[in-house]
Swiss-Prot record:
Further details from the record: Some rotavirus strains are neuraminidase-sensitive and require sialic acid to attach to the cell surface. Some rotavirus strains are integrin-dependent. Some rotavirus strains depend on ganglioside for their entry into the host cell. Hsp70 also seems to be involved in the entry of some strains.
Protein name per Swiss-Prot or TrEMBL: Outer capsid glycoprotein VP7
GO cellular component term, pick one: viral outer capsid
Purpose of the protein: Calcium-binding protein that interacts with rotavirus cell receptors once the initial attachment by VP4 has been achieved. Rotavirus attachment and entry into the host cell probably involves multiple sequential contacts between the outer capsid proteins VP4 and VP7, and the cell receptors. Following entry into the host cell, low intracellular or intravesicular Ca(2+) concentration probably causes the calcium-stabilized VP7 trimers to dissociate from the virion. This step is probably necessary for the membrane-disrupting entry step and the release of VP4, which is locked onto the virion by VP7.
InterPro entries: VP7, VP7_1, VP7_2
Positions annotated to bind Ca(2+) 2: 177, 228-229, 231, 301
């Protein structure tokens, strides 16, 4: 009986010693692998151009924060940039290969060939009918013209912000604007907008609901019209529906992947609808050059600084759908 107990105890001790040996062997092997791996990392690290990620990056709800822990000096290599310009620039430059030249200049700033798209538009009024902004970053050049200053301001308000829009049936319903973010946006070849404010008995205030000639005209033959009326009041609306489409829109916030560069003019256009607030100049910039080559040279020279004031977004603007948050 004692012999069996001694044998069991001896077997247990042998297994314990064997297990201890195995564990020590595994530990030595792991230490060997770990030390070799760390040595490899130390040797290779100076030769690797990697992007470092901080542990405590702030989550702010905005992508505008400039993170200083990016070791790659060219953060825009995987992005696309659209540059919109009036067609008069092509006429003045009169060089069939000018886009290739500009592409090579963008390459010196870290934008590979094929990542920058140059798109022309006829004029502000035409561009207002159907602005389409599809790139990760979009820069719109607008040449200042005193005669089209208000058109430029409305177009800037449209493309620098995101809008959520619904159709309006003005033949059946009255409409009212609920707050400052609520606007009526009209687009078309010719938009003439007339409104008649109503009292609580749905009678016209200073106008007759049955006679559109007594309505108050707020836009005349415009291609783009952003209408702002007194909030909380019902309105009967008259629009030239054969040449214009009107939508009830809500401004959701800034469209941060779009910037507008005003070419010329003494001051940057103010697109703020509320007269009690400071002028809205965020992502609104100005270049004072007479020649278009000078304008493009300046854009190339400062393109990365301009991009830093923007945020890369995947959503695009296609007003053909008249639904601005896509």
């Amino acid at each position: 009986m004692y012999g069996i107990e001694y044998t069991t105890t001896l077997t247990f001790l042998i297994l314990l010693i064997l297990l201890n040996y195995i564990l020590k062997s595994i530990t030595r092997i792991m230490d060997y692998i770990l030390y070799r791996f760390l040595l490899f990392v130390v040797i290779v690290t100076p030769f690797v151009n990697s992007q470092n990620y901080g542990i405590n990056l702030p989550i702010t709800g905005s992508m505008d924060t400039n993170y200083q822990n990016v070791s790659n000096p060219e953060p825009f290599l995987t992005s696309t940039l659209c540059l919109y310009y009036p067609v008069e620039a092509e006429t003045e430059i009169a060089d069939s290969s000018w886009k290739d030249t500009l592409s090579q200049l963008f390459l010196t700033k870290g934008w590979p060939t094929g990542s920058v798209y140059l798109k022309s538009y006829t004029d502000i009024a035409t561009f207002s009918i159907n602005p389409q902004l599809y790139c990760d970053y979009n820069i719109v050049l607008m040449k200042y013209n005193a005669n089209s200053e208000l058109d430029m301001s409305e177009l800037a308000d449209l493309i620098l912000n995101e809008w959520l829009c619904n159709p309006m049936d003005i033949t059946l319903y009255y409409y009212q604007q609920t707050d400052e973010a609520n606007k009526w946006i009209s687009m078309g070849d010719s938009c003439t907008i007339k409104v008649c404010p109503l009292n609580t008995q749905t009678l016209g205030i200073g106008c007759l609901t049955t006679d559109t000639t007594t309505f108050e005209e707020v836009a005349t033959a415009e291609k783009l019209a952003i209408t702002d009326v007194v909030d909380g009041v019902n309105y009967k609306i008259n629009v030239t529906t054969t040449t214009c489409t009107i939508r009830n829109c809500k401004k959701l916030g800034p469209r941060e992947n779009v910037a507008v560069i005003q070419v010329g003019g003494s001051n940057i256009l103010d697109i703020t609808a509320d007269p009690t607030t400071a002028p809205q100049t965020e992502r609104m910039m100005r270049i004072n050059w007479k020649k278009w080559w000078q304008v493009f040279y300046t854009v190339v020279d400062y393109v990365n600084q301009i991009i830093q004031a923007m945020s890369k977004r995947s959503r695009s603007l296609d007003s053909a759908a008249f639904y601005y948050r896509i």
